[in-house]
Amino acid sequence: YCNFDDMKQFAAVMKKSIAAQSSGPSPVQSYASHSDNIVAVLERNLTEAPNYILNSEYNFGPYLTANEQLDRANKLYNVYKEGFGACNLTQHRYGPEYSFYIVCGFDDFDDFAKKSAKSDSIYEKSLMDEKLDIKVHSDNMLIKVMD
């Protein structure tokens, strides 16, 4: 995963990457099958690169307004933030789907178990009776491979 402060920084990184690929003997192919998502950071509390991240993606009912979808995303984000501590909330900017992403860090899988249990407890107390209109949800755990 990559983070950019703004689209100007993204453009500078991409320009350098494309120049590096075209100046070598052949372009580097790093991925087999993937999709790129450029997101807008709505709230940033994850300021250091943790060993692992939980990336949770939420799509809400298309009948909701953009503000209603944001409201639901914020409700879920608050649960993750309280349970995991440092988390980021991002929203689709460019890419294949209109989603909200909640990204939280953890040190190891013991830490994940503790933070997950805390989040589950908070969710059960605060959102079990909420109509959140979640259409699709997925989670991915990613490991940091370099600093």
Predicted feature locations:
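Short S/T/G/P-rich N-terminal loop/turn motif that feeds into the first structured element of a domain
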Residues: 1-147
